[in-house]
């Protein structure tokens, strides 16, 4: 980001009206978005509202107080209750900006319609601007007022805008540390969305509730809500990715590592390329889960573009687990303790200590056909008061779980390893190929389900028999008309 700033050229001094020249372009875009929302509301076309929201997100970096205020004057009736409320959240402008807004409002006027969609869009625009300007107290007040207004509206075209309002409503309270205050309100909104069959709203609110619970480590409540909430086909890819990520976190805490790994990897794979921060979080949890499963992630996972720095602590952790060095594992855990605490993965890393010991024991079992338990304790660097007894207990448990193929000679205090057999004579290669084939088939099915088809296309298709009958009738009719013409002639 710093590099981009340095590469920019210094603009030449512009005349005094250059400030006003940049403002109408942004305002003009907002006016086009307003007309798009208006046409979508009249035609009841939800796709146009979705497109308007996407265009707004692209414009958010260009917003300023004068542009937002001018758009409010353009789309709402000046002096109305909604206009006065939204204008009160915006910062006061200087006289120059006020003159610019007045001039633009005078040149182009909109026939003011009491469209609920346009009113909700104004709430959304002001809320986005306040959050970007870090005016969180005003954003909380604006979001609360917008939610109170949305509760009284039951229109399909409003649901798209309402889902975005729900997100920023939760975000504004999260940024001020008051996320617990709105949990009851989010549950009430989810109930209203369910009664109105608003599937997009249900999807968004379920994710916000899961995020709310997980923020306070209420994993049991989150799982109860998730299991009882209605599920249906995803309407938003972003919301589906968030759901998979939260599901992966819940499954990880519940020790269901296989399901957690699948959810976290699927969320990272489905996430948009621009959502780098989200994909980084998904990869962090996926790495931890794979380590807990006894797998070692590939080096390419940590070398993904834009993720090298964020995943460096987890790379060093993976290296310690791969080697089975307990001392190196402790050093990495202590060095990056603040990072792991911020990522909320510190408790999971504590669980990895057992995996490190088991990996080291497996390496010892492969390297030595017979080794004393004293040497095993020394190589594992066990720091307990009675390391030999602990080593014997660890080896016994590993043999029972099938992690190593060995026996214990209690009389002499040895661990005797058995010869390793041919892995290709077992079912492991078949299971590995089966998992890869299932993964490819699932990806193909998801890609097919994600395709868009024209509405009622199956009704427009004409069977071959009907086509032949129609053509035959047309030929007979043409022949009959020709015969009548001959008779008249």
UniProtKB/Swiss-Prot annotation:
Q: Which PROSITE patterns match?
A: PCI
- The annotated regions of Basic and acidic residues compositional bias extend over 457-482
- Which stretch is the leader sequence? none
Q: Which UniProt keywords apply?
A: Nucleus, Proteasome
Instruction: Provide the assembly information.
Output: The 26S proteasome is composed of a core protease, known as the 20S proteasome, capped at one or both ends by the 19S regulatory complex (RC). The RC is composed of at least 18 different subunits in two subcomplexes, the base and the lid, which form the portions proximal and distal to the 20S proteolytic core, respectively.
Similarity-based family: Belongs to the proteasome subunit S3 family.
Supply the InterPro entries for this chain.
Answer: 26S_Psome_reg_C, CSN3, PCI_dom, WH_DNA-bd_sf
Question: What are the boundaries of the region Disordered?
Answer: 1-23, 454-489
What is the designated name of this protein? Answer: Probable 26S proteasome non-ATPase regulatory subunit 3
Role summary: Acts as a regulatory subunit of the 26 proteasome which is involved in the ATP-dependent degradation of ubiquitinated proteins.
PANTHER family given in the database record: 26S PROTEASOME NON-ATPASE REGULATORY SUBUNIT 3, 26S PROTEASOME NON-ATPASE REGULATORY SUBUNIT 3/COP9 SIGNALOSOME COMPLEX SUBUNIT 3
GO CC field: nucleus; proteasome regulatory particle, lid subcomplex
Q: Molecular function (GO) terms listed?
A: enzyme regulator activity
Q: Matching Gene3D superfamilies, A to Z?
A: 1.25.40.570
Subcellular location, in the record's words? Answer: Nucleus
Q: Which residues form the PCI domain?
A: 241-422
User: What SUPFAM superfamilies does this protein map onto?
Assistant: Winged helix' DNA-binding domain
Tell me one GO biological process term: regulation of protein catabolic process
């Amino acid at each position: 980001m710093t590099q981009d700033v340095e590469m920019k050229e210094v603009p030449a001094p512009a005349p005094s009206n250059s400030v006003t020249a940049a403002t109408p372009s942004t305002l003009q875009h907002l006016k086009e978005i307003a007309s798009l929302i208006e046409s979508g509301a009249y035609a009841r076309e939800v796709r146009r509202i979705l497109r308007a929201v996407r265009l707004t997100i692209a414009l958010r970096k260009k917003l300023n107080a004068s542009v937002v205020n001018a758009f409010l004057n353009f789309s709402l009736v000046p002096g109305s209750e909604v206009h006065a409320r939204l204008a009160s959240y915006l910062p006061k402008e200087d006289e120059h900006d006020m003159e610019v807004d007045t001039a633009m409002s005078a040149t182009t006027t909109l026939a003011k319609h009491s469209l609920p969609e346009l009113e909700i869009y104004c709430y959304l625009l002001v809320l986005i601007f306040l959050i970007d300007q870090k005016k969180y107290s005003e954003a909380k007040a604006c979001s609360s007022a917008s939610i109170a207004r949305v509760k009284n509206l039951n229109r399909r075209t409003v649901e798209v805008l309402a889902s975005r309002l729900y997100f920023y409503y939760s975000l504004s309270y999260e940024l001020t540390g008051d996320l617990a205050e709105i949990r009851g309100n989010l549950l009430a909104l989810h109930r209203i969305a369910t009664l109105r069959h608003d599937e997009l709203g249900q999807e968004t609110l379920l994710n916000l509730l899961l995020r709310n619970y997980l923020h306070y480590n209420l994993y049991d409540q989150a799982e109860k809500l998730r299991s009882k909430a209605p599920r249906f086909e995803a309407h938003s890819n972003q919301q589906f990715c968030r759901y998979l990520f939260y599901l992966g976190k819940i499954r990880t805490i519940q020790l269901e590592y296989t399901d957690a790994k699948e959810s976290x990897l699927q969320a990272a794979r489905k996430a948009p390329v621009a959502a780098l921060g989200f994909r980084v979080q998904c990869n962090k949890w996926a790495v931890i889960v794979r380590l807990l499963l006894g797998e070692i992630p590939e080096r390419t996972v940590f070398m993904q573009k834009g993720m090298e720095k964020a995943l460096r602590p987890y790379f060093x952790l993976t290296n310690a687990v791969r080697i089975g060095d307990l001392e190196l594992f402790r050093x990495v855990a202590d060095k990056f303790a603040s990072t792991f605490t911020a990522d909320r993965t510190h408790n999971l890393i504590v669980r990895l200590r057992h995996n490190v010991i088991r990996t080291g024991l497996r390496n010892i079992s492969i390297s030595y056909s017979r080794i004393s338990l004293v040497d095993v304790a020394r190589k594992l660097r066990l720091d307990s008061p009675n390391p030999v007894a602990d080593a014997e207990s660890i080896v016994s448990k590993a043999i029972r779980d099938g992690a190593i193929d060995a026996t214990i000679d209690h009389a002499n205090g040895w661990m005797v390893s058995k010869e390793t057999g041919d892995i290709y004579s077992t079912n492991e290669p078949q299971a590995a190929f089966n998992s890869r084939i299932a993964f490819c088939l699932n990806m193909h099915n998801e890609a097919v389900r994600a395709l868009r088809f024209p509405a009622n296309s199956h009704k427009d298709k004409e069977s071959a028999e009907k086509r032949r009958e129609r053509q035959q009738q047309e030929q007979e009719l043409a022949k009959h008309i020709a015969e009548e013409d001959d008779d008249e002639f």
